[in-house]
């Protein structure tokens, strides 16, 4: 039976669960022997929607709470005895690719032709090379807008134009906050960037999301095989276009972030070297897994792996995937100012895009903490960090931050001082002896 139909043949599931109950001693049952009826009622199981019938548009039209419950139930059912096996791998010729040129123009091709297209671009790989892997189809306006903002921000970054923190029409993503005056900290930081050397580079967009036209493909995507395909292409860029691994940065969203991890491992297997950085933008849950192997993104898949989580109970996951994981408003259910789980997931892309614009690299100060409550009570520990393009490569652990519900999303002002870290330096700064915690 097609494992996807497990949700449509619930009577059979319940019957099997009942048989297992009589055929096995509970004390000897392993963790994978959990039955659906152990945590869902028969009525809930019978009301479950088949994964074949769920669309991105339906999730967008649901309330955040309803969509989260639906996704969580399907995810947990898929994990019981590995009910879903990964089976979908897009053909390389069907994966659209776009190479952005320094003048803002783009070259359209597909994954099969990526390396040849790169060879035709003058000076490709002389500077930073960013590989952006999309994770959802742009049939969603939220996905389309987020991806557009990211590409625009990279073009601005690579063209060396400084973007003011406030008061610029291009920066104002339709927010009334865009006309507010800059704070003193914003002005000081913006002034400091006037003498900064601009960054140059190449942007390649692998539009994996366009192949995930329904929830079935999304759920059944073979993360490892798809990542291996992209990893081999990156090796070709190194071998045939002289792109060294230390300048390759993969930025990937949603399920694409999990694919990026597999791509990084494949690159290392074939070259013996690691990619410089992988940035995960709201990495998703993995529904279909090989029961005999670990899959998805993890620290060690690149020299540095950082992740931004904005929809932990919806499209994303609260599972740590990087050297450093940033949780916006803590491991909360959804990003502030969003109305559905798709929009919430895309906020990670919007935040990262904002940090790319020259002058905004430190718009998202964060503090090492285990919860939002710890952050709000100034009980975080460790040094201040910045989420986004300016994240320090020596960071480790979980970081919490707050953001604005509308753009500009970054708080911009420095993070609040935390007692455990900054308090140790008060007596040195003031020249007075004070009791420390």
Curated annotation (Swiss-Prot):
GO molecular function per UniProt: lipase activity; serine hydrolase activity
Signal peptide (residue range): 1-19
Cellular component, GO annotation: extracellular space
Induction, as annotated: By beta-ecdysone; in males.
SUPFAM superfamilies the record matches: alpha/beta-Hydrolases (SSF53474)
Keyword Transmembrane helix annotated: no
Pfam family, one: Lipase
Compositional bias per record (Polar residues), positions renumbered to this chain: 174-184, 427-437
Tissues with expression: Synthesized in the fat body and ovarian follicle cells and accumulate in the oocyte.
Keyword Secreted: yes
InterPro entries assigned: AB_hydrolase_fold (IPR029058), Lipase (IPR013818), TAG_lipase (IPR000734)
Keywords: Secreted, Signal
Principal location: secreted
GO BP annotations listed: lipid catabolic process
Region listing for Disordered, in residue ranges: 161-194, 405-437
Location in the cell: Secreted
Family listed: Belongs to the AB hydrolase superfamily. Lipase family.
Protein task: Vitellogenin is the major yolk protein of eggs where it is used as a food source during embryogenesis.
The protein's name in its UniProt record: Vitellogenin-1
Species: Ceratitis capitata (Mediterranean fruit fly)
Taxonomic lineage: Eukaryota, Metazoa, Ecdysozoa, Arthropoda, Hexapoda
Gene assigned in the entry: VG1-GAMMA
